[in-house]
Regions:
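C-terminal segment of N-terminal export signals and the immediately downstream linker at the start
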Residues: 22-53, 57-59, 66
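Metal- or metallocofactor-binding catalytic centers and their adjacent structured scaffolds
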Residues: 62-137, 395
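Shared catalytic-loop signature of beta/alpha-barrel
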Residues: 84, 88, 93, 100, ...
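Metal-dependent enolase-superfamily TIM-barrel catalytic cores that perform enediolate-based chemistry
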Residues: 152-245
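Extended hydrophobic packing segments that form well-structured cores
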Residues: 362-397
Length: 397
């Protein structure tokens, strides 16, 4: 069979193109190198790093890439012990298989599945896995979640958004004096933020329904963005009763864990806003699933957060990629953890908006030496919160 009539120039050109394709698809294509690393990377160590009432979780790998997450809302010594034990489930696993590892830890023990100790620890592990994966690909975590849905993130508290706490506990029925005092505090808050600012009232589960219903009617003229934690988590019937009698939007979710505890609020249509906490509900992985569920019911997220800059930044990554979002709780004054422990790379502007966190990964630098100083400070150690009524009986916290 005769060979096709191809010029020498065409042959050289095609050979050069083949060589170029091979180079681009190989060593000079950073994506290929990253893909190779994500295939061979393994978890080699998981270390709890206590710091006052918080515990940081450090996950190390055989490629020298390290991720960090934060445990909050647990007794630190117990949390640290559980994380140390859970390493057995994570050893030699690929940290980029985030969903697989989430399921492995969550389902590992039938008697701990869904409980606060396991889910809070899993939340920190999940943050650290996303941190590692973002660092491997050299991008902020929100890029891995589908990219940002907004250019900046509205936050509170700040000069443009004020949250008034209930300051309880309160007995079953409030007196006119107690109601008037709460109304006065809310009126003062409205003055602080002005007519364009956001005003939030946190009932903190310490206001019984009769007081809350009275109060909601009295503060309606102050344009409240939402009432937070109006009932003990999971008490759907009370939420339904309050939803029928209160015109201000109701919000809850900070102490509910995973999609399975959030779903009843949506199905019963007894709240207007969901407040998942990235450190309570199962980490970034669960935050994105909760956001998708809530979006189907047209319920926006206003995530709760009382974590340091590490956990807070994880939450910011999640909401950056969440379409239906209202506002993020974000404490930036350093009272939760000294600012030198976890150094962030985002700022809140004069209008109360946080810039998008930059990567790679979470984009937070952890100073383990500074964290150790917090752990050694007797004034910053964990104390069990016990709230009592005037008669000595135990109140909800």
């Amino acid at each position: 069979m005769p060979l096709p009539n191809v010029s020498r120039r065409a042959l050289l050109a095609s050979a050069g193109l083949a060589m170029l394709t091979e180079v681009v698809s190989g060593q000079e294509n950073p994506g290929v190198a990253v893909a190779d690393r994500t295939t061979s990377i393994k978890i080699t160590r998981v270390t709890p790093l206590p710091g006052g009432s918080k515990v940081y979780v450090k996950i190390e790998t055989n490629h020298g890439v390290t991720g960090y997450g934060e445990i909050t809302g647990l007794e630190p010594k117990v949390a640290a012990a559980l994380v140390t034990s859970v390493f057995e489930l994570l050893k030699d696993e690929n940290p980029t298989r985030i969903e697989h590892l989430w399921q492995k830890v969550y389902r590992s023990h039938r008697d701990m599945r869904g409980g606060p100790f396991m889910v809070h620890c899993l939340s920190a592990i999940d943050m650290a896995l996303w941190d590692i994966t973002g660092k491997l690909w050299g991008v902020p975590v929100y890029r891995l979640l589908g990219g940002p849905c907004r250019d900046k993130i509205r936050c509170y508290p700040n000069a443009k958004a004020y949250k008034q706490a209930a300051g309880g506990p309160y007995p079953f029925a409030g007196t006119p004096k107690e109601i008037a005092a709460l109304v006065e505090r809310i009126a003062d808050g409205r003055k602080k933020v002005g007519p364009e600012g956001a005003m939030i009232f946190d009932a903190h589960c310490c206001l019984p329904p009769p007081i809350l219903i009275q109060l909601a009617g009295a503060i309606q003229p102050y344009d409240i963005l939402f009432l937070e934690e109006v009932a003990v988590p999971g008490n759907i019937e009370v939420f339904k009763r309050l939803k029928e009698q209160i015109r201000i939007p109701l919000a809850t979710g900070e102490r509910d864990r995973t999609i399975w505890e959030m779903l009843p609020y949506l199905q019963e249509r007894c709240i207007d806003i969901l407040q998942p906490d990235c450190g309570h509900t199962g980490g970034i992985s669960q935050m994105r699933k909760i956001a998708a569920l809530a979006e189907a019911y047209h319920v926006p997220l206003a995530p709760h957060c009382t974590m340091s800059f590490l956990g807070l930044t994880a939450s910011l990554h999640a909401v950056a990629a969440t379409p239906l979002f209202l506002i993020q709780e974000a404490y930036t004054d350093g009272h939760i953890m000294p600012s030198g422990v976890a150094r962030k790379n985002w700022e809140v502007d004069a209008d109360g908006y946080a810039s998008l966190p930059q990567g790679p990964g979470l984009g937070v630098e952890v100073d383990e030496g500074e964290l150790a100083k917090v752990a050694a400070d007797p004034k910053k150690q964990y104390r069990w919160p016990v709230l009592k009524h005037k008669d000595g009986s135990i109140a909800d916290y």
